[in-house]
Swiss-Prot record:
Pathway stated in the Swiss-Prot or TrEMBL entry: Amino-acid biosynthesis; L-leucine biosynthesis; L-leucine from 3-methyl-2-oxobutanoate: step 1/4
Keyword annotations from UniProtKB, A to Z: Amino-acid biosynthesis, Branched-chain amino acid biosynthesis, Cytoplasm, Leucine biosynthesis, Manganese, Metal-binding, Transferase
Name of the encoding gene: leuA
Gene3D superfamilies assigned to the protein according to its UniProt record, in alphabetical order: 1.10.238.260, 3.30.160.270, Aldolase class I
Phylogenetic lineage: Bacteria, Pseudomonadati, Pseudomonadota, Betaproteobacteria, Burkholderiales
HAMAP family, per database record: LeuA_type1
UniProt source species: Burkholderia pseudomallei (strain K96243)
Enzyme Commission identifier(s): 2.3.3.13
Name by which UniProt lists this protein: 2-isopropylmalate synthase
Length: 515
């Protein structure tokens, strides 16, 4: 048995199913490249058959990310598997991940199929996938609630057909650690050809035990792959948190005895990137990546840490990518200093043109803000990448003018482009942000409902840039938009337009759990 634990990240597929977490193609590529920098073993880039947008994103990631295995989900049918294979063709290394439900409840109520029909479909799906690759993963959906004898029969058959990874999914987060770990162990013991496949765990956090269940699957069950997401992103209560799995296995190597290929210094940058793109704020007390994860308020604890860090710290903040919030650049800093700091932060831009554009944004910010922090630099790059993506978007922010006097309703004028043609919307509102949104809607008329408006300061002080998240809903579809600017109202306009672009761009995608 291998002593390496494979990290399978599904932020771009299962994580995106969290309401409001839909991402553009460009955003998915940025996250995939960060996962590659982190040396994630397998990146599940999407569900190719769900939409043309997902297919394109998987295909582009497969062509650009070369150091990780790229994977696509596919239902257990020839059409889905063919679509996945077509999207993955440019990859250096790829995997097809096919699945079908095996629990009595799912077979009867969702699939309306008999166990024998499910057995045959699973077997034939893996056989068809073998035409494209030897790297095939099979998941019995809702496996933790499946009949043991039937589950063993199905898994033995798909391994015989060529499945090289068997993923035991706790789809609804029903498992508890001891039982789930023993489930994986029992399957490995009872299936005669189990040694021909790596067993994997995929847990959801409905009862708050996704990480505990996954670790039990590894320690008790002998699983050697964990499926997880950055920040535990996912629908309902989320998925297994990548950062918690990685640091638990690394910190307690004395207990787990497993090696990892992950560059842990890229964990916090990945967490911040996913949070910024999705608009899902990381709770301050979140393990590893929360703002308070390495903070000590107790006087006794502070004294101990000052004398010897290992008195109260079992991990070092710098080992997971935390850096001091220090002033690094100012308006007199040159292009080379800016480029060097980007490299130190692990931020890469694809071309000199992008670097020049980001540096121009930096100089503009430095004229308005005396102190530039690392977080500002990351926001600048994010803003530039978003602007490049918006070149092909339906709506593009241009400018904002506003007027507000005590006792009068604020007025706003927003200039933005619609497919390249500039329009100007003017309106009043209960406040400057309300007026700005109303001004945009005078030209757009989206009919979307505003579900969430939140503001977060990127750094400290009155000159801090504001990061605004806007969540919109229309026809049952929920999207997030994020905008940054030292002017909160301008950041709000950018966020609103970003959300509108997401509403406009992608038709509803198939959800594999409901397909």
């Amino acid at each position: 048995m291998t002593d390496k634990l494979i990290i399978f990240d599904t932020t771009l597929r299962d994580g995106e199913q969290s309401p409001g977490a839909s991402m553009t193609k460009e955003e998915k590529i940025r996250i995939a490249k960060q996962l590659e920098r982190m040396k994630v073993d397998v990146i599940e880039a999407g569900f190719a058959a769900s939409s043309n947008g997902d297919f394109d994103a998987i295909q582009t990631i497969a062509s650009q990310v070369k150091d990780s295995t790229i994977c696509s989900l596919a239902r257990a049918n020839d059409k889905d598997i063919q679509r996945a294979a077509d999207a993955l063709k440019p990859a250096n290394s790829f995997r097809i991940h096919t699945f079908i439900a095996t629990s009595p409840l799912h077979m009867e109520k969702k699939l309306r199929m008999t166990p024998d029909q499910v057995f045959e479909q699973a077997r034939l799906a893996v056989r068809f996938a073998r035409k494209f690759t030897d790297n095939i993963e099979f998941s019995p959906e809702d496996g933790s609630r499946s009949d043991m004898d039937f589950l063993c029969r199905v898994l033995e058959a798909v391994i015989a057909e060529g499945a090289t990874t068997i993923n035991i999914a706790d789809t609804v987060g029903y498992g508890v650690p001891e039982l789930y770990g023993n489930l994986v162990k029992t399957l490995r013991e009872r299936i005669p050809n189990s040694d021909k496949a790596i067993f994997s765990v995929h847990c959801h956090n409905d009862l708050g035990m996704a990480v505990a269940n996954s670790l039990a699957g590894v320690k008790i069950g002998g699983a050697r792959q964990v499926e997880c997401t950055i920040n535990g992103l996912g629908e309902r209560a989320g998925n297994t948190s990548l950062e918690e799995i990685v640091m638990a296995v690394k910190t307690r190597k004395d207990y787990f005895g497993l090696d990892l290929g992950i560059d842990t210094t890229q964990i916090v940058p990945a967490s911040k990137l996913v949070s910024q793109i999705t608009g899902f704020v990381v709770q301050p007390n979140k393990a590893v990546v929360g703002a308070n994860a390495f903070a000590h308020a107790s006087g006794i604890h502070q004294d101990g840490v000052l004398k010897a860090r290992d008195t109260y710290e079992i991990m070092r903040a710098e080992d997971v990518g935390w850096t001091a919030n220090k002033i690094v650049l100012g308006k007199l800093s040159g292009r080379n200093a800016f480029k060097q700091r980007l490299q130190e932060l692990g931020v890469s831009l694809d071309s000199e043109a992008e670097l020049n554009a980001a540096f121009a944004r930096f100089k503009d910010l430095a004229d308005r803000k005396a102190e530039i922090f690392d977080e500002d630099i990351i926001a600048i790059v994010t803003e530039e990448e978003s602007a490049l993506a918006q070149e092909h978007e339906h709506y593009k922010f241009v400018s904002l003018a506003q007027r507000s006097e005590t006792g009068e309703r604020p007025q706003a004028k927003v200039v933005f482009a619609v497919d390249g043609d500039e329009v100007a919307g003017e309106a009043s509102g209960n406040g400057p942000v309300d007026a700005t949104f109303n001004a945009i809607e005078t030209e757009v008329g989206s009919g979307a409902e505003l579900l969430l408006y939140s503001v977060n300061a990127i750094t400290t002080g009155t000159q801090a840039q504001g990061e605004v998240t806007v969540r919109l809903s229309k026809s049952g579809r929920i999207v997030n938009g994020v905008g940054t600017d030292p002017d909160i109202v301008a950041a709000s306009a950018k966020a609103y337009i970003a959300a509108l672009n997401k509403l406009y761009s992608n038709a509803d995608k198939l959800n594999p759990q409901r397909a």
